[in-house]
Amino acid sequence: MSASAVYVLDLKGKVLICRNYRGDVDMSEVEHFMPILMEKEEEGMLSPILAHGGVRFMWIKHNNLYLVATSKKNACVSLVFSFLYKVVQVFSEYFKELEEESIRDNFVIIYELLDELMDFGYPQTTDSKILQEYITQEGHKLETGAPRPPATVTNAVSWRSEGIKYRKNEVFLDVIESVNLLVSANGNVLRSEIVGSIKMRVFLSGMPELRLGLNDKVLFDNTGRGKSKSVELEDVKFHQCVRLSRFENDRTISFIPPDGEFELMSYRLNTHVKPLIWIESVIEKHSHSRIEYMIKAKSQFKRRSTANNVEIHIPVPNDADSPKFKTTVGSVKWVPENSEIVWSIKSFPGGKEYLMRAHFGLPSVEAEDKEGKPPISVKFEIPYFTTSGIQVRYLKIIEKSGYQALPWVRYITQNGDYQLRTQ
């Protein structure tokens, strides 16, 4: 069982648009939603599921709107919330910004979309590429003329239109890895993981098939343990265009890509990561007078790689003043509104070590610092480099017209949640 009705409300709880799918819940029930929401908010007991009598309200907030689904029976809550977020995504793709004004300006098309998105309370067509084939924003109505069945009915590829043409056929593939790291004050790595994704920008004519091969080191989490140097990917998620049956058989990533930009796959490695940029800090607080920092930054990756736009964010006391800085490289800036100093290094080659000193005055009367000190955080980007060692061995482009296409592959490693605690 799914939703009985779906509403879009403004911030005051006024109904902007609604669709009754099952007729088993009185449409005026939604009038109870906002009073219950405000009451729960005041009590500090706000929940994504609210109830009045036998009716459940499942809701999300987006910009200045509430999207609410009602149900009287046992609904599959995860399905309903997934549907509400999908509604936001589809509306945003149609109207750029989903807010009260765009709802008021597009009543006709929204009713058409709600009719296609859900049928008798069950999600139906939620792929915006399919919806855009026969619901156009320009006419605010269904396309007229000779009736044409949706691509899904004809077994065509729903995420790619036919007849696409480019003068220059190109594919850009980015392997992007974000490093999440937490280091304790005594230098122990408490948490480390790599979150990766393969993103593509496709400008290819016709209906091409692409085959992507990754290096032999890469294993997927259900292949069993391999050699000690292998890279075992976890939580692998593919775009819907990937032929999963082919992948299950021989690990070939084969697909007909959507046109333009999309994420082909994402993955995670819960593994010990050697900190790429290591920070050592010595902080000396002289009572009632000053605080001094000595920060050493060391790049722990190969010399042939370089980290770009490195930013080291060092927290300082709220009442610090009169800053003085000295550094062997880059620039240092005090950001008092964030209670931090930012050491910026435009280019940080591998195997290098740099030093920065900072001096702040402190007021003669100071409050006892009972709260824990915020950690040092680091931002960086290393091109032509992956922490996991994942590499693209080949990217084949096959199209019946036989045109030549240029594949471009790029690797980027960047910071995720990268923090080092201080003494």
From Swiss-Prot:
<dbReference type="GO" id="GO:0005765">
    <property type="term" value="C:lysosomal membrane"/>
</dbReference>
<keyword id="KW-0813">Transport</keyword>
<dbReference type="GO" id="GO:0032588">
    <property type="term" value="C:trans-Golgi network membrane"/>
</dbReference>
<feature type="modified residue" description="Phosphothreonine">
    <location>
        <position position="152"/>
    </location>
</feature>
<dbReference type="GO" id="GO:0030136">
    <property type="term" value="C:clathrin-coated vesicle"/>
</dbReference>
<dbReference type="GO" id="GO:0035646">
    <property type="term" value="P:endosome to melanosome transport"/>
</dbReference>
<feature type="modified residue" description="Phosphothreonine">
    <location>
        <position position="223"/>
    </location>
</feature>
<dbReference type="GO" id="GO:0070062">
    <property type="term" value="C:extracellular exosome"/>
</dbReference>
<keyword id="KW-0945">Host-virus interaction</keyword>
<feature type="domain" description="MHD">
    <location>
        <begin position="168"/>
        <end position="421"/>
    </location>
</feature>
<dbReference type="InterPro" id="IPR011012">
    <property type="entry name" value="Longin-like_dom_sf"/>
</dbReference>
<comment type="function">
    <text>Subunit of clathrin-associated adaptor protein complex 1 that plays a role in protein sorting in the trans-Golgi network (TGN) and endosomes. The AP complexes mediate the recruitment of clathrin to membranes and the recognition of sorting signals within the cytosolic tails of transmembrane cargo molecules.</text>
</comment>
<dbReference type="GO" id="GO:0005769">
    <property type="term" value="C:early endosome"/>
</dbReference>
<comment type="subunit">
    <text>(Microbial infection) Interacts with HIV-1 Nef.</text>
</comment>
<dbReference type="Pfam" id="PF01217">
    <property type="entry name" value="Clat_adaptor_s"/>
</dbReference>
<dbReference type="GO" id="GO:0030121">
    <property type="term" value="C:AP-1 adaptor complex"/>
</dbReference>
<dbReference type="GO" id="GO:0030659">
    <property type="term" value="C:cytoplasmic vesicle membrane"/>
</dbReference>
<comment type="similarity">
    <text>Belongs to the adaptor complexes medium subunit family.</text>
</comment>
<dbReference type="GO" id="GO:0032438">
    <property type="term" value="P:melanosome organization"/>
</dbReference>
<keyword id="KW-0653">Protein transport</keyword>
<dbReference type="GO" id="GO:0035615">
    <property type="term" value="F:clathrin adaptor activity"/>
</dbReference>
<dbReference type="GO" id="GO:0035579">
    <property type="term" value="C:specific granule membrane"/>
</dbReference>
<dbReference type="GO" id="GO:0006886">
    <property type="term" value="P:intracellular protein transport"/>
</dbReference>
<dbReference type="GO" id="GO:0043231">
    <property type="term" value="C:intracellular membrane-bounded organelle"/>
</dbReference>
<keyword id="KW-0333">Golgi apparatus</keyword>
<dbReference type="InterPro" id="IPR028565">
    <property type="entry name" value="MHD"/>
</dbReference>
<keyword id="KW-0472">Membrane</keyword>
<dbReference type="GO" id="GO:0045202">
    <property type="term" value="C:synapse"/>
</dbReference>
<dbReference type="InterPro" id="IPR050431">
    <property type="entry name" value="Adaptor_comp_med_subunit"/>
</dbReference>
<dbReference type="GO" id="GO:0005829">
    <property type="term" value="C:cytosol"/>
</dbReference>
<dbReference type="InterPro" id="IPR022775">
    <property type="entry name" value="AP_mu_sigma_su"/>
</dbReference>
<protein>
    <recommendedName>
        <fullName>AP-1 complex subunit mu-1</fullName>
    </recommendedName>
</protein>
<dbReference type="InterPro" id="IPR036168">
    <property type="entry name" value="AP2_Mu_C_sf"/>
</dbReference>
<dbReference type="GO" id="GO:0000139">
    <property type="term" value="C:Golgi membrane"/>
</dbReference>
<feature type="modified residue" description="Phosphothreonine">
    <location>
        <position position="154"/>
    </location>
</feature>
<dbReference type="GO" id="GO:1903232">
    <property type="term" value="P:melanosome assembly"/>
</dbReference>
<dbReference type="GO" id="GO:0060155">
    <property type="term" value="P:platelet dense granule organization"/>
</dbReference>
<keyword id="KW-0007">Acetylation</keyword>
<dbReference type="InterPro" id="IPR018240">
    <property type="entry name" value="Clathrin_mu_CS"/>
</dbReference>
<keyword id="KW-0597">Phosphoprotein</keyword>
<dbReference type="GO" id="GO:0005886">
    <property type="term" value="C:plasma membrane"/>
</dbReference>
<keyword id="KW-0968">Cytoplasmic vesicle</keyword>
